[in-house]
UniProtKB/Swiss-Prot annotation:
It comes from the Eukaryota. Its main location: membrane. It catalyses: 4beta-carboxyl motiol + reduced [NADPH--hemoprotein reductase] + O2 = 2alpha-hydroxyl, 4beta-carboxyl motiol + oxidized [NADPH--hemoprotein reductase] + H2O + H(+); 2-deoxypolytolypin + reduced [NADPH--hemoprotein reductase] + O2 = polytolypin + oxidized [NADPH--hemoprotein reductase] + H2O + H(+). It comes from Polytolypa hystricis (strain UAMH7299). GO terms for biological process: secondary metabolic process. SUPFAM superfamilies: Cytochrome P450. The gene is polB. It is an enzyme of class 1 (oxidoreductase). GO terms for molecular function: heme binding; iron ion binding; monooxygenase activity; oxidoreductase activity, acting on paired donors, with incorporation or reduction of molecular oxygen. This is Cytochrome P450 monooxygenase polB.
């Protein structure tokens, strides 16, 4: 037994050294005509450059963008996976986003970047992507007006319980935890209804699933040598699998009940009671689009809903934390939090206003503050990553040849902080898009509709926070409406002390993670 524990580390170390030597002597092919950024003249230069990207990826991308990307030139950067990537300039984005999957594949990147092969999933990626695109597009985005009352009701209940209702004294609240709680419960209310969103045991299990699922997708897909992935995959996937099974045990009976309810309504051949519950609408969409599901349908749907919940809640929670960090640390001259309070108070004067979709269109300043925060704080430093599929490679618009298997992408974080596209881009200008929208509406005869392209949920080739083109996030309209309601409710009902400075985000590989230790002081406002 002693010899076993001695031999294993020695063998692993030897294998690691051999792999590093192999990477140095036989590197992945990359375009020789493009400039390199992040590589140095040193022993084991390529492996060391890759290791530096674990904590320094955003800095490398920014340096490359400043030297080459801003001038419209592609460049090559190292990556934690030991596979160099080509970063394209902004003027290549429309070309990149319109290439067919057979030429530039986003699916191949998802499998590797998210560690799909090591996750506890039964369905294949194509099936999941098709399911999410259809369900989100038809069952959620088109029913936002109908589910807004439930969104508001759950936000009110959760914010009140999380931040308190004492108008006499201040209360210390962990911002990240508060946002996660609000997003988790409201998201579950929309997905699964009232029973699960207030089940404390289920919510704790789901939170553990989201944490381990996030760790799986973040760590496994960005681990340096490929041979570490199976090891890390086993270690991280075990708890992920356990919490997924526990979560499915709560969700599956609900799905089965909704399936029986839908079948019963069809058998009655009557209008029945139309339900706007997301699960029910999803089941209707599955039947309508004739999505083929092998095996137990209830288990499949429950699993898909859980992975959808993870994707929606993890990203929206991080975005909400970023937004409030920006709002509370904004320049005192702007008095931003009070400005948003006044806007919300002028719009939401009654319970009916909180449930009215038209109220959302009036939140010009809030929408602008959200878009500005998403612009400045991308959750990923790279965007639109795609893999070259043709065996003979492809030609970039500028004539450079990129070989088969290489990844192309855009340095989204660096691009969205370029003064060429956004004056004073390094600063947080919460009313930037409100001003631009007012200017666009003043110049155009179409009025308010002329500024829609500046809405927080509207992607462009200069605003990739929700990706772009065919890759655009299908749930972005839901996410922005949820964020608007949260900001409005908190601003109307709570005083919050400003932050002296904005805590820096932590970078790990491509991910930019907002502070999860920042605490804020809140107090319930006295309602006149």
């Amino acid at each position: 037994m002693y010899s076993f524990f001695l031999v294993c580390p020695v063998a692993f170390l030897g294998f690691t050294i051999c792999y590093l030597v192999y990477v140095e002597l036989f590197p992945h092919p990359f375009p020789k005509s493009l400039p390199l950024v992040g590589f140095r003249k040193e022993i084991f230069s390529r492996p060391r450059a890759s290791f530096r990207q674990i904590l320094g990826s955003s800095q490398t991308l920014a340096e490359g963008y400043e030297q080459y990307g801003a001038a419209g030139r592609p460049y090559v950067v190292p990556d934690t996976t030991f596979q160099p990537q080509v970063m394209l300039p902004q003027n290549h984005i429309k070309w990149l986003s319109t290439q067919p999957e057979s030429v530039l594949s986003s699916e191949a990147v998802r499998v590797e970047r998210n560690g799909i092969n090591y996750l506890p999933v039964k369905s294949d990626l194509k099936s999941s992507v098709l399911f999410i695109d259809k369900i989100i597009g038809k069952s959620l985005s088109q029913n936002l007006d109908l589910i807004q009352p439930d969104m508001y009701d759950e936000i009110r209940h959760t914010v009140d319980s999380t931040m308190g209702t004492d108008v006499a004294s201040w209360r210390e609240v962990n911002l990240s935890e508060a946002m996660s709680t609000i997003i988790d419960r409201t998201g579950n209310r929309i997905l699964f209804g009232l029973s699960l969103c207030r089940n404390e045991v289920y919510l704790r299990i789901l939170r553990c699933f989201i944490i381990f699922m996030g760790a799986s997708t973040l760590l496994i897909g960005q681990l340096p040598p490929w041979f570490l992935r199976p090891i890390a995959g086993v270690l991280i996937t075990i708890p992920t699998f356990i919490f997924k099974k526990l979560s499915v045990a709560y969700v599956r009976p609900l799905v089965k009940e909704r399936m029986q309810s839908v079948s019963g309504e069809e058998d009655d051949q009557g209008p029945g009671k139309t339900s706007h519950d997301f699960v029910t609408q999803s089941i209707n969409s599955v039947r309508k689009f004739k999505i083929t599901i092998e095996g137990d349908v209830a288990s499949y749907l429950a699993e898909q809903f859980l992975f959808l919940a993870f994707a929606a809640m993890a990203t929206t929670g991080a975005a909400a934390t970023n937004i409030f960090l920006d709002i509370l640390s904004a320049s005192p001259q702007i008095n931003l939090y009070e400005l948003l309070h006044l806007e919300a108070a002028s719009i939401f004067k009654s319970e009916a206003d909180w449930m009215s979709p038209s109220s959302m269109k009036e939140m010009i300043n809030t929408d602008s503050a959200i878009r500005e925060s998403l612009r400045k704080n991308t959750l990923q430093s790279r965007g639109l990553l795609k893999q070259v599929m043709p065996k003979d490679g492809i030609m970039l618009p500028d004539g450079a040849h990129v070989p088969h298997g290489m990844w192309l992408g855009v340095p989204a974080q660096a691009m969205q902080n370029d003064d060429e596209f956004y004056p004073n881009a390094d600063g947080y200008d919460p009313l930037r898009f409100a001003r631009l929208k007012a200017d666009a509406e003043a110049e155009c005869k179409d009025g308010p509709s002329s500024g829609k392209h500046l809405d927080a949920a509207h992607p462009s080739d200069k605003y990739l926070s929700f990706s772009y083109g065919r890759s655009s996030c299908p749930g972005r309209w839901f996410a922005v409406r949820l964020l608007k309601l949260i900001i409005a409710y908190i601003a109307v009902h709570y005083d919050i002390k400003p932050l002296a400075h904005r805590p820096k985000n932590f970078s790990f590989g491509d991910a930019s993670i907002p502070s999860f230790t920042t605490k804020i002081m809140v107090r319930r406002r006295k309602q006149g």
